[in-house]
Every structure is written in structure tokens, then in C-alpha cells.
Amino acid sequence: MLTDLFYSTFGCLYSPTSTMDVMGTARRKTVVRLNVYDMYWLNDYASNIGVGIFHSGIEVFGVEYAYGGHPYQFSGVFENSPQDAEELGETFKFKESIVVGETERSTSDIRKLIKSLGEDFRGDRYHLISRNCNHFSAVLARELTGKDIPGWINRLANLSGSIPFLEKCIPQEWLTPIVLQASVDEKKRGSVDSAEEATEKLVVRSLNDSRTTILDNRTANGAIIMSASSSNSDRICMSPSSSSSASSCDTLDYDDLIVQTPSTFSSEKKSRSNSPPIFRIWNTIKATINGTQQTAPTGAATVIPASSASNIGKTNSTPGTTSNGLAKPTCSEC
């Protein structure tokens, strides 16, 4: 009586499409299907010897997972729309869908499983006889449901000794469905783009390191400091001198950059003449004659005392000349 009451009350929780986990909540089961495709015109010849050549994939949660070959060392497992032969190619024709069983795995669990199987079912390890799409379908179906797929799906592998030439007769595009080839091309483009981006970053970093090294070597004996950056122009900072504690900065272009060292400054000083400019000589002469204060362009003043100015024009030892060696003006010149 109590048992009947229990099942009448809670029997819905024990339906074929759900189970109970340890927490007492229902876990929904999902149907797992095996979709079979016929390589139709090749089977016209293979059927004469009692062997069919089929492609298969496992459908779960509205996605079909299958395996194909390519020459690269990464996964050959791919996804496609269930029962869509056009995504596979012209040589594929949908044949039938077979329910293998049910699974309690979630979508995230299945994706982890697919990724794990992809490490074993690599594209470059594909073999038409010993490691083909049907072998992958059998492994995935067993992992999800604990059941095997029908034996006739992969009969070709069991009779491979009878037709050793068959693999060479099948075109390569049959081993690599269109949807798998598109996935491979996309992954290759992504790898190339990543490699190019990494190379560009490496070149830029190398250039920046070179600029910094060169400028550090110049700064050891020079008067400027540069902060390296990735742009064409950088911050140029003048090192503070002994008389000034502040440093001035400016933004200059690399093409216009001229680094001056102390040796350059000293060579510039040596190249300059120590003799005063002509206008300073003329101002000195005028100040000497007039006995007035004259301000030089540099701000220094020259003062001629009046006592000294009174002696201007007196002869020294040579007639016709003044004490400073200048000729006396004649009457006509006056």
C-alpha cells in the first residue's frame, strides 16, 4: 500500500527521460543520434563486393560532431548542422539517422570531451581504413551512452584486406569535408595573424631597446637625456648644469636630433676667435677720445677718467702724432 502510494505520488520523477542525482534533483537525459551519410556514386561500385562506404557523425544537443583528415597536427574533429549533406560536400548524401541511446552529460561536459578526443583524433592521423570518421563516432557514442554503433557502418575497416587499393582511389576531398576544410583554413589564418602580430611586437620592442641603448651611451658623456617611446618623436631633456638644478625638456624628432658632448662644446670654443668684434673696437676708440662712459653690448662699461682724457692729443716723441699713436688732424681736416 505504501509502495503504491509512493510511486503514484513521485513516479513522475522516474520517467525514462530523467534521473535523480545525489541532491535529489532530476537530471534530464538527452537523445544521442548517429547520422549516416552515403558516398553514393562510389557505393555503386563498392556494393558489388558487399561493402558500403559511409560517413557518420554523432548528434547531441542539436550539434553534429564528426571526424575528418587534414595534413596538420591539430584536431580533425569538426561541427556541422545535423543531417546537412551540403555542408559536407557534393559526394555526401544523407542516408538515415539512428538513435544510439541517451546521455546525462551537459553541454559543457560534452565540449570538454570533444576537446579531449581531438587530441587523439588529429587531422594528420586520419586513415581511411584504420582510423576514419566511423571510428570516432563509435568512441564518442560509447562515451556518451555506453553503447556501440551498428557494425555495418564501419564494415570497410573489417574487410580492408580485400580491397587494399581503395584508399588510393578515393579523392582527397572525400576525406576532408567542406565544413572541415573551412575550419582548417580559419585556424590557419588565425595562426598566421597571431604570428605576424607577435613578430611586429618583437620588432618594435627591439627598435625601442636599440634607441634606448644608443642614447644611454651618448648620455654617459653628453648633455641630453631621452625617454624612449614607440613614436617617431621623444622627450629630450637637457641635463642640469652646475649652476642650475632644473632641467628643461622639449619634444624633438629623431631626424633632427643632434647630440653634443663636452668635447664638442670645447671644440666649438676653440674655433671661436678671442679678438673683440669691430664694433667693440670702434666704441672703445670713441670712449677714449671723448672721455665718456660707453656701454658695451655685453653690459660691461668702460670709463675714461678726465685726467687721462686731458692728455689725449699730446705728442709723445714723434712730431705729428698723439700719445696714442694717432695722427694729428691738419687744418684742412679740421
Curated annotation (Swiss-Prot):
It comes from the Eukaryota. Keywords: Cytoplasm, Hydrolase, Nucleus, Protease. Residues 310-325 have a biased composition (Polar residues). Its main location: cytoplasm. The keyword Manganese does not apply. One of its GO terms (molecular function) is deubiquitinase activity. Gene3D superfamilies: PPPDE domains. Residues 310-334 are annotated as: Disordered. InterPro entries: PPPDE_dom, PPPDE_sf. Expressed in the pharynx, hypodermis, intestine, head neuron and tail neuron. GO terms for biological process: proteolysis. The active site is at 55, 133. Protease which deconjugates SUMO from some substrate proteins. Has isopeptidase but not SUMO-processing activity. Collaborates with ubql-1 in the export of ubiquitinated proteins from the nucleus to the cytoplasm. Belongs to the DeSI family. Disruption phenotype: Worms lacking both POST and ubql-1 have a shorter lifespan and display an accumulation of ubiquitinated proteins in the nucleus. It is an enzyme of class 3 (hydrolase). This is Desumoylating isopeptidase 1 homolog. Disulfide bonds: none annotated. The keyword Hydrolase applies. Residues 30-174 form the PPPDE domain.
